[in-house]
Amino acid sequence: MPLSYQHFRKLLLLDDGTEAGPLEEELPRLADADLNRRVAEDLNLGNLNVSIPWTHKVGNFTGLYSSTVPIFNPEWQTPSFPKIHLQEDIINRCQQFVGPLTVNEKRRLKLIMPARFYPTHTKYLPLDKGIKPYYPDQVVNHYFQTRHYLHTLWKAGILYKRETTRSASFCGSPYSWEQELQHSQRHGDESFCSQPSGIPSRSSVGPCIRSQLNKSRLGLQPHQGPLASSQPGRSGSIRARAHPSTRRYFGVEPSGSGHIDHSVNNSSSCLHQSAVRKAAYSHLSTSKRQSSSGHAVEFHCLAPSSAGSQSQGSVSSCWWLQFRNSKPCSEYCLSHLVNLREDWGPCDDHGEHHIRIPRTPARVTGGVFLVDKNPHNTAESRLVVDFSQFSRGITRVSWPKFAVPNLQSLTNLLSSNLSWLSLDVSAAFYHIPLHPAAMPHLLIGSSGLSRYVARLSSNSRINNNQYGTMQNLHDSCSRQLFVSLMLLYKTYGWKLHLYSHPIVLGFRKIPMGVGLSPFLLAQFTSAICSVVRRAFPHCLAFSYMDDVVLGAKSVQHRESLYTAVTNFLLSLGIHLNPNKTKRWGYSLNFMGYIIGSWGTLPQDHIVQKIKHCFRKLPVNRPIDWKVCQRIVGLLGFAAPFTQCGYPALMPLYACIQAKQAFTFSPTYKAFLSKQYMNLYPVARQRPGLCQVFADATPTGWGLAIGHQRMRGTFVAPLPIHTAELLAACFARSRSGAKLIGTDNSVVLSRKYTSFPWLLGCTANWILRGTSFVYVPSALNPADDPSRGRLGLSRPLLRLPFQPTTGRTSLYAVSPSVPSHLPVRVHFASPLHVAWRPP
């Protein structure tokens, strides 16, 4: 007969009123391999091979990799981005505020001014892959919403726009490391020429032709080239070679189609620029053809913005405007839409500043698509950037590691009687500037509407030689496209034309979706909080990623602190969202926890999720191990607040490791659900003096409680770690002390997942809330009793205990970077790696 739930609780000594014998007899039984095996069989924990089909869904949990079907919202609003410009002299400003910075703070702030990203390999994808066809039924809507989002980011100074192979434009205030083209005159031939009078500054290519001519005639000196920097010594930071003058320049705008055209296209020049250009073309088309294996240069027209100035020349190259002169092919022909307005605005948009960049191809390195901003806000969209190539395969980059505060450290740090508020940093990632040299690696964009629609519609063929014909122009006309564009015209107006052109954008601020970004953000906010803490030593400021919290003794004090800190952050160029400032009172909500003076508990929404999970959890049905991963993820978060902690979940971990289905028996489910229905806070550790010590040998245990000594023997020899754990449990139950000295590192770590399962669960409950102090064996007063010698009494140790705040120390004082240590020697661990069903 399977083990009943009541018997199981009694076995684990979880019920107070059990008629069990003394702990010294009962606990060692739980370490018995035979008992653990019988219990595992009774609870069906060891039976991993099942023939019944697996269950792939439990409540909201599906397998880890089965994606939920995303829902497209045609009404999505593109969020607005403030003009974020982090001050370049951030270190000086912090020093004015708080005095000299520590080594650590300086190092962290230098890391992000500017951030650098140089992967060894980068895979370039065609522009067609720029916008992912994530919503097959809403292709056109998704295309324009995404293009509008990208345009918004570019206008806010978050993206660069690739103008030519070696130049980019952006909006917003420039940084010193962004070399403006106009200002590089000092290097003579090396510079891109500044704008000649009479040619609007909109044109990215026209003004630069003469300097191109000079280059191709004179050849480049080795130290010059499109990358030589305007300041000596700066060129090294760009990390790219100066290329000979035979470099091919392709604009982003392919003539009329998405393919790159290797011929000089005179007809595409705007009329008032054609004179300048023809002179240039006659030279370029010959010299470049000979020097670069038949590839000519293509210059594209960028129509000026003035109304009605679209000349015939520009129309012929623009897919959108070609419809104006063509005969409608049907009632759903796009020419009906294009003829709705006279002025469709420019084909292209240019930023306030033009800078030089390393050679950047008209390609992308990652795709983008839109999703809901978050589960609670489905009205706004969020851009997802997929740079997963940098996390896998040959292009993999190993990201730097950083400390995440653990629960106990967080509680020690924040569990206090302070009054709290949390600040919301708007678009935190987009505060940190990225060096332009990283642009070629982080490219996003789109191949233009014609190409995008052609790729997705079955009837059109993308053949380079067909794009000239009118018939081919109308291949993309369809009822669905026409209806979609008419609806979008109401929203975007003339911008439909702008967005239908191809574009390549690079990141000017760090993107989400690259493993470097969370690391840099964590470094940045922790350095800022460190500065704030030193400026206001009687208060507490703490951050994790973009979540910044401030604590002060009283509400009035907190409000004045809030004003001072907000003004300081604004002076650095950090944008706060005042509407989202939350005042928590004396219990802080942070990182999914509620932290008060009594300790820490999980937030209510997580508790509700757990209750829902147990309601939906099927009994006696094998559950797919991927679903188990989701269940363990949720339960693992709240495990430290339960009686038995992580050890209770070990059977689940074992099945995930074996990639086998797991079957919940009624008893095991009842045991877990009871564990999670009563959550106990994790309390703050207090400093104190340790006066209780435990030690063990494989055959016996010994305790030193004050001046009192105790010893005992085990019925059978036990593994040393198990014996030490039992001794610690006896010390806690005999003395009630919350501070115990031990010389065993495994007990000290308080990770009991590697012990026999029943013992691990019970020990976790007995030792919950206990702090351990390391005492070397030679000084351990319990060492002699454990060896059976009570006569020799060593002098009583008074070991001080100081609670740790882990790597998240309050003051950012850290040693300088250590020199490279030799490779460590790994010894085989005497512990089992994980719990396995016997």
Swiss-Prot record:
Annotated region described as Terminal protein domain (TP), given as residue ranges: 1-179
Enzyme Commission number, as recorded: 2.7.7.7, 2.7.7.49, 3.1.26.4
Reaction catalyzed: DNA(n) + a 2'-deoxyribonucleoside 5'-triphosphate = DNA(n+1) + diphosphate; Endonucleolytic cleavage to 5'-phosphomonoester
Chain ranges of the Reverse transcriptase domain: 352-595
Keywords: DNA replication, DNA-binding, DNA-directed DNA polymerase, Endonuclease, Host-virus interaction, Hydrolase, Inhibition of host innate immune response by virus, Inhibition of host RLR pathway by virus, Magnesium, Metal-binding, Multifunctional enzyme, Nuclease, Nucleotidyltransferase, RNA-directed DNA polymerase, Transferase, Viral immunoevasion
Activity control: Activated by host HSP70 and HSP40 in vitro to be able to bind the epsilon loop of the pgRNA. Because deletion of the RNase H region renders the protein partly chaperone-independent, the chaperones may be needed indirectly to relieve occlusion of the RNA-binding site by this domain. Inhibited by several reverse-transcriptase inhibitors: Lamivudine, Adefovir and Entecavir.
Taxonomy, superkingdom: Viruses
Region feature (Polymerase/reverse transcriptase domain (RT)): 342-685
Description of its domains: Terminal protein domain (TP) is hepadnavirus-specific. Spacer domain is highly variable and separates the TP and RT domains. Polymerase/reverse-transcriptase domain (RT) and ribonuclease H domain (RH) are similar to retrovirus reverse transcriptase/RNase H.
Miscellaneous comment as given in the Swiss-Prot or TrEMBL entry: Hepadnaviral virions contain probably just one P protein molecule per particle.
Family the entry assigns: Belongs to the hepadnaviridae P protein family.
Protein name stated in the entry: Protein P
Organism: Hepatitis B virus genotype A2 subtype adw (isolate Japan/Nishioka/1983) (HBV-A)
Gene: P
